[in-house]
Amino acid sequence: MRLRAAVSALAVPVLLLAGCGQGAGPSPTSASGAVGSAGVSDSAGSDSAGSDSAAASSEAPTPGPTVPPETAVAAPVPADQLPTATGKIGEKPAFSFPKTSPPPSLQRQILVQGSGQEVKKGDWLITNYLGQVWGGKIFDNSYDRKKTTAFQIGVGKVVPGWDVAMAGVKVGSRILLSLPPADGYTSAGNSQAGIKGTDTIVFVVDILESIPADKGGQADAKPVPLPATTAVTVSGKLGVQPSVKIGPKATEPTKAQVLRLSIGTGAKLALDDQVLVQYQAVTWTNQPAVSTWPAANAAPQNPGGKGPEQITVQKDSPFAALAGITVGSRVLLLLPKTKSAQGESPAFAVIIDIVAKT
């Protein structure tokens, strides 16, 4: 079943911030950075007095602490041992660094306390951010691009310091992070971004939205019945995982086609928009193909990394038909069979929930 190839060929890989703009942000860890499973204690601690500090071991020769699984939040370093950052949420910050050496532990400081929901592992975050080497150059920022960045935390898709430090923060917050090497790019560094294996890296992050891994389209969207001639049955309430069945009289599609199942109240999509979607698919012979929806018995932190996937409404692709569809909607995407050097891929019926525009 090659639906994932058909979809993923057009899907934007999870934005790991490494390939954005000219620089590189919190990309996935390498094999040497085996700290991607690090967690956060159930108690987020208090950030109002300064910073949170992740407990760490100091096994040589790692040039920074190794964050153990399920690390507890340690006592913060004094505030004057961390950089200061100018600006309000939405404004590009500027760092001023102290003359002291970087702290050897993961530090988090709440610069502006938000009032939204708490971020949980497995959530997708929509953010603005700026990353800079301690006392050195800026290697990436979204403010100059004037475009937010989305990524999933707690599942090993970003550097471990982000996986750990984002959890427990409230939406609407601006935070400062200081990541020693083991919590960033480890001893390997990131040569493309100009980050050495001994560098501490710091970030300001504006957390604008948090999207749970099981979030679908709008539960109160306006339903739209399928034409009877479609001979495809879609079951399940709006906003939760659906199911789809191809009837015996259904005509196999010869081109990509989108049929509305509900109309959300969000913004209309346009070509080149990036969006988060949930999808559930079957082949034209009703064989289960692929789904982004987390399993019903999945752990709360969503360790498998399932959940919304980011795609581009790209011209000359099946997703081009999503242009004009509103965020919050549910649609049925019919994909014809295709042939390639790898063989033939069957026709598919895909239920897509448009979760958010990023």
Kindly label every feature range from the protein language model.
Residues 2-358:
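Cross-family detector of peptidyl-prolyl cis-trans isomerase
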